[in-house]
Every structure is written in C-alpha cells, then in structure tokens.
Regions:
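Glycine- and aromatic-enriched mobile tails/lids
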Residues: 1-3, 8, 19, 31, ...
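Core beta-strand elements of the Rossmann-like FAD/NAD(P) dinucleotide-binding domain
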Residues: 7-10, 185-194, 370
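N-terminal Rossmann-like FAD-binding beta1-loop-alpha1 element of flavoenzymes
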Residues: 12-37
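Conserved N-terminal glycine-rich FAD pyrophosphate-binding loop of Rossmann-like flavoproteins
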Residues: 41-74, 80, 237-241, 250-252
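Conserved redox-cofactor binding core of oxidoreductases
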Residues: 45, 98-186, 198, 242-246
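Dinucleotide-binding Rossmann-like beta1-alpha1 core, especially the glycine-rich loop
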Residues: 74-101
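Glycine-/small-residue-rich beta->alpha transition segments that form the dinucleotide
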Residues: 192-194, 198-203, 380-381
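An anion/pyrophosphate-binding glycine-rich loop and adjacent beta-alpha core
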Residues: 222, 228-341, 399, 408-415, ...
Length: 569
C-alpha cells in the first residue's frame, strides 16, 4: 500500500529546529505568522546548539568597557579579510539584545554582583563571552527556546520530517517544500508563503566531528538544487583540541577549550615538549594561537612524527593543583573521574576535529537569499565569519540571524497570497519519496557514508594539495555512481516504518553534492587563508581576497570567484 501524502499549509515554514530555527519560529509568530517548524530529529534536541557547552559572544559591557564595534573588530580580524562586513556588523550589534532577551526568558546566564558575567576566549580582546556554565550553555539555550515555544498556538512543530527538496510556485518564488516522515514513510508537502532554512552546517562529512548526525549539509544541498548560490564553501573550521583519548562518554569533545585558556593548560607533543612557539605563538604555556594556527601546529607535529600515540597532541594540567582544578572545572571534575581521567596525574590526548563551516547560502541583511520567498539563518548562512570564525560567535550567529530571519519571513508572508506548489516539481519529489523504480535493495549506505567521511578527512582536511583534492573529487564521483539516482525500497514494503538505509540514502544525496562543493572550491582557491591551507600554495595572496560562489547548473557544480564587495545586497 502506498501512503497518501500529508499536505500542510502555513504562512512560514522553518526547516531545522536548532537555536536558529526555534528563534526564527518564535520571532515569526510574534510577527503574526502561523509557523510550521520541522526537523529531521526531535524538535530542539538535534543540531549543534544543544551540544555546545561553552560560551556565547556579546558585547554587553557590564563588567569591562565594551561595544559592538570592538566585537566587530575582533570578528573581522579572525576572518582574514573575507568577512561580509554587513553581516558581521549586524551580528555584533544585535547580539546584546538577544542575550538579554534570553536572560529575560530564564536561560540562567552566570551572574556576578547582580549582572551577567563574561569570560575571555581566544581572539577576543576583552571578556565578552557569556555562559550558563562551561558544560551546559548550549543545552540551556535550547531548553529555553523550547520552553518559550511550548503552548504557542501559532507554532506547529513536527519532528522526524526529512525535507528532500524546496519547491517553487508558478512564478518561480519558493512556495514550500516536499519531504517524508522517517517513522512512517508518509510523504509530506508543505505550502508556505515564506520558508526559512535553519539546517546548520556540514561537519558530518568528516570522520571526527563535534556536532550531531543532523549536520550533513542538508540546507546547502536544498538551496543549490533550488537555484541559490553558496559562498566560501572551502572554509571548514577544525577545532584544534577536540578530545581524542582516553575514552570520554557523555561530554562534548571540545569541552577542553575554556579550561585550557583559563588554566594555561600545556599543549605537548608525543615527546612531552611544548611546541606552539614553532608556529607563531609567542608563549607556549598559554593558549594564544587562533584556532586555524593551533590546528596547523598540531597537524605539523603529527606529520613530523612527534604526535601522541593516537595521532594528536597531549593537553596537560599536571602543573595545576587539585584545588585549582576543582575551582576551575567544578562538577566537570567528577564527570571526568567517572571516565577514569585524573588531570592531576595524567594528560589527555587531543586532536583537531571538524567543528564549524564558515561558508553557506548567500543572504542579505534581512536574511533573504537570492530566491524570493527563501530566507536563511544560523550556520547555513555563508560569509559572516570569512575564512575563520571567531570563537564563541556560533550560538551568537544562531540567535541573531534566527531572530532576523523569522522577522523578515513574517513580513514577507503578510505581503503575498499563498502560491500553489509547482505540480511537476511536487510530482518529481513525491516520486522520489515513493516506492516506484527503487534503487538497489542491498546498497550498504552506512559503508558509503564511512567512505565519504574517510575521503574528506584524508584529502579535504585543513591542509590540502591539488593531488589530494583531485583524489577526493574522483572518490566522491565513484560514491555518487554507487549511490544511484533512486533510494532503496522500504524494507518489507512501501510503508513499513522507519528504515535507516533509506534515510541514509537521502543523507548521502545531500552529503555528496556538498562534499563536491567543498572540494571544488578548495581546489580553485590557490592560496592559503584562514581555515583553508594549501600546502602547494602556502601564501595568503591579496588577489584572493574574494569570495567564491558555487551554483548547480544542469546537475553540474560551477565555482566562480567574486570580489569581496560584490556579495548579494
């Protein structure tokens, strides 16, 4: 039996229910719109924010003199000359209001002397990074936004919805989307006056990453297939000190950063030598390297045969007293002890881990994309961070741009009548979701994902060469051929319920096109800048102070350069 499509009509469709998507839904509803918020997992419990444990940057100026201009200057400096200055300025100007609104909603920012307290973070010239505590900031933000949405009759929520394509109306304006319910297999169509992409980044492309399984680049692929441009796809940020060994259960793999910075934790190579001064740091004992340079230093030590046993570096707090560790780490010490980690007598191993993506969908100051009716928010937006994101700006981007996108989408929805989805596009998408003409039932999608992640880790990591990137593109093409053009049939029939193989097929459909966009953009950029380091083109060149755009034309990815001042307006 073939399941009948579930048809939804709404004013604003929000795809992705992390912090950006939830804030967009809240703001759109405050603007008078009826909202349909969908996510491929549980609402407010997937994505990156819920896993982010540390700090959020905003120039509150409550403890030390600060201003959005200071925050902006640090953001621009970190971006290595490629930040979209308009988006960066909006990010820094709007951040304090979002932080204070979250405070009013009960997020529970840490306080001192009756004001929100802040700490420093790498790349910031002063203490402006707020937190709940050093292990619960992201979860607290997510919980707060879920609570604000609860009971809001204008926000309809649906988890376990896999959106496979955006759909235009007869006039070409984006008018909704088509997907399927991963639990039942039922097709879903959504007609909307405005659509917000809030699908996060692409770190799942890499074997070692700090985010959830949702981060496979879905929004980038949806935008490309709909006709939108992406920019800066070559810039994938690797967090330099992701946990490597011993085994750590139930904790964020990037949790070491604030403690490294606060306590002066020592980075040591496999010979137990400090080494960061070889790569641009003035002082080994303090974490002063920006993330891209710290990643470079660890990779180079491993490459030189001076890595730790598992292929990274050591992080040591053995010079700190037990009292100092307890004061800094608080209850984290007990959680580490449960993992048999005693920092007073042992170092841990750390290594770079895929953490964030600076590139994404081209959007303007109102979060409008090039496609009428389509907006974007959060990590899916490209250009704000340039070639390297400033630490603690990630959740800031999510809430600031989520709020802006929701507001703009609601305004747009008021100006137009709902459009009928283009029938041919809907039929094509529903046919792909349906059971007819299915692909090979014995396709091992999990193995294909593992192979793609290995290709990206080995050939499209932070340090690239033309030979590596050529190998990556060839390997991606092989995987695309093996994947085929049709998903496998539901196990046991057309409506047999959850089928992981089928879900992974749709994941790979997106992951492969996004991986190709990253590799092609990296191959085209013949310089080193920020998170993109070419070992065969080691200099940062003035002529390359420009963005690259990626488009999909006739099924072929096209990469072209654009001057920094020529972003969409």
């Amino acid at each position: 039996m073939t399941l009948e499509p579930v048809a939804i009509e709404t004013d604003v469709l929000v795809i992705g229910a992390g912090a950006a998507g939830m804030y967009a839904a809240i703001e759109a509803s405050r603007g008078g719109a009826r909202v349909f918020l969908v996510d491929r997992s549980l609402i407010g419990r997937g994505g990156a924010t819920v896993m982010a444990q540390m700090t959020v940057a905003a120039a509150l100026g409550e403890e030390v003199p600060d201003s959005p201009r200071h925050h902006y200057n640090d953001t621009i400096a970190a971006g290595r000359g490629l930040c979209d200055e308009t988006l960066a300025q909006l990010l820094c100007e709007d951040a304090p209001a979002c932080i204070r609104e979250l405070d009013a909603w009960g997020v529970g920012w840490a306080r001192k002397d009756n004001h929100i307290t802040a700490t420093t973070a790498p790349g910031h010239d002063r203490a402006r990074c707020v937190y709940v505590d050093f292990i619960n900031t992201g979860p607290a933000v997510s919980k707060t936004l879920r609570t604000v949405m609860a009971g809001n009759k204008d926000i309809r929520k649906a988890g376990d919805i896999c959106i496979i394509d955006l759909v235009a109306g007869s006039d070409g304006e984006i008018a909704g989307a088509v997907g399927w319910h991963v639990g039942s297999g039922a097709p879903v169509t959504v007609a909307a006056k405005a659509t917000v992409l809030a699908t996060g980044g692409l770190t799942r492309l890499y074997r070692r990453n700090s985010a959830s399984l949702n981060m496979g680049g879905d929004g980038y692929a949806l935008a490309l297939r709909a006709g939108a441009s992406l920019i800066d796809m070559e810039f994938v940020q690797f967090f330099p000190i992701g946990h490597l060994a011993p085994r750590l259960v139930g904790m964020d793999p990037i949790m070491w950063d604030p403690f490294r910075y606060k306590l002066g934790g020592r980075l040591l190579n496999g010979r137990m030598e400090e080494f960061t001064s070889r790569y641009g740091s003035d002082e080994d004992g303090k974490y002063v390297l920006p993330r891209d340079l710290a990643t470079y230093a660890i990779f180079k030590e491993v490459e030189a045969g001076r890595g730790s046993p598992h292929g990274g570096a050591y992080l040591s707090f053995e010079h700190c007293s037990a009292a100092a560790l307890r004061a800094a780490f608080g209850p984290v010490i007990d959680r580490l002890a449960a993992n048999a980690i005693d920092l007073t007598g042992m170092p841990v191993e750390v290594a770079p881990i895929a953490h964030y993506h600076m590139g994404g969908v081209v959007a303007d100051a109102q979060m409008r994309t090039e496609l009428p009716g389509l907006f974007a928010a959060g990590e899916v937006v490209g250009g704000t961070s340039g070639a390297n994101r400033l630490s603690s700006n990630a959740i800031t981007e999510a809430v600031v741009f989520g709020r802006r996108a929701g507001r703009s989408a609601a305004v747009h929805a008021k100006t137009i009548a709902r459009k009928d989805l283009r029938a041919a596009s809907v039929r094509a998408a529903l046919d792909l979701v349906g059971a007819g003409n299915c692909g090979a039932p014995d396709l091992n999608t999990a193995a294909l994902i593992a192979r793609l992640q290995a290709i990206m880790a080995d050939e499209v990591g932070p340090f690239r060469t033309a030979a590596k990137l050529d190998r990556a593109l060839a390997g991606i093409a092989v995987l695309a051929d093996e994947l085929g053009e049709r998903p496998p049939r539901f196990a046991g029939g057309t409506d047999a319920g959850f089928d992981l193989q089928r879900l992974e097929w749709f994941d790979l459909r997106n992951m492969l096109v996004v991986a190709r966009a990253v590799a092609q953009s990296a191959l085209a950029r013949t310089e080193s800048r920020g998170a993109h380091q070419r070992e065969d083109f080691s200099q940062m060149l003035p002529d390359w102070r420009r963005h690259q755009r990626v488009r999909l034309a006739g099924g072929v990815l096209q990469v072209s350069g654009a001057p920094a001042e020529a972003l969409a307006s």
